[in-house]
Amino acid sequence: MKALCFEQFGSPDVLQYKEIHDPIINPNEILLRTKAIGLNFADIYRRRGAYHLAGNPPYILGYEGSGIVEQVGTEVTDIAAGDRIAFADVPFANAELVAVPKEKAIPLPDAISFEVASSVLLQGLTAHYLTQDSYKIKAGDFVLVHAAAGGVGQLLIQIIKMKGAHVIGLTSSKEKADAAYSAGTDHVCLYSESWCEEILQITKGHGVDVVYESVGSTLEESFKATKIGGTVVFYGMAGGDPAPIDPRMLMDTSKTLTGGDLWNVLTTYEERKTRSHQLFDWITTGKLHVQNPTTFSLENGADAHRLLESRKSTGKILLIP
């Protein structure tokens, strides 16, 4: 099979598209021929060497995608060759063939395309647990969403509005502000302006109930924009490492800092299936809109990495084998 690999950490230039051995599946796995593969910031971090990678080179990135079953293991009885399957937490996805454990194989309804599934699963499941588990959104809440034009940001906006809350989005450009408004945000502030002050004005001096913080380097400012007793949910650091937070500030202001990691939520097959199918239901009933993705061939994966790193993209980037 063909795969997008790398031998050493570095820039997108280290990525190579080459022939490697097909995966050999275990009895409890299926062999999936991928039709669409999601690109995520975690792939960037791993390519740079910022995240741990198991095994030895050549490394294969990716852990989200969808496709058609080619073969099933001897212990798999409820999945058959030809079935449409998606996955959100399986390694080595940047390849034509992926071995998927049966408990991580999410059945794909006919109404959901491979492109939509690979656009929404990881980011949609992230937005789902952030608004359900990390901080349960209530009607009337004021919510600040960082990187509001990104894939998670646009889905967060829609789910938050679905729950009856007010959304303030943060973006890096007026073009991205348009994407955030299209997703349904009530206000947009730009990183290049005095956004903390703007948010305090919008909230009549109180601050927001919760901040969904995915930039990292803006963590201190996020707390300044949060009301007394409010919450900051830290779930990413696309803009760099955060400055240390003084726990005395948390005590004095009764503010809460909480973290979020999808893998601590998707611990069972039922969790994966139930949460995924709620996303699929929202999409098929028109409650959740998924922006058309930007697609690259798997062979041109380095260009996809460059676009994602540039922070000029909006919505999801997909690799097509």
Task: Describe each model-derived feature in a short phrase.
Residues 11-14, 19-66:
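N-terminal glycine-rich beta->alpha transition that marks the start or flank
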Residues 66-90:
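A glycine-/small-residue-rich N-terminal strand-loop-strand element
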Residues 120-193, 216:
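Mid-domain Rossmann-like dinucleotide-binding core that forms the NAD(H)/NADP(H) cofactor-binding site
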Residues 195-205:
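Short amphipathic alpha-helix with an adjacent loop that forms part of the alpha/beta core around
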Residues 218-287, 320-321:
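Glycine-rich phosphate-binding loop and adjacent beta-alpha segment
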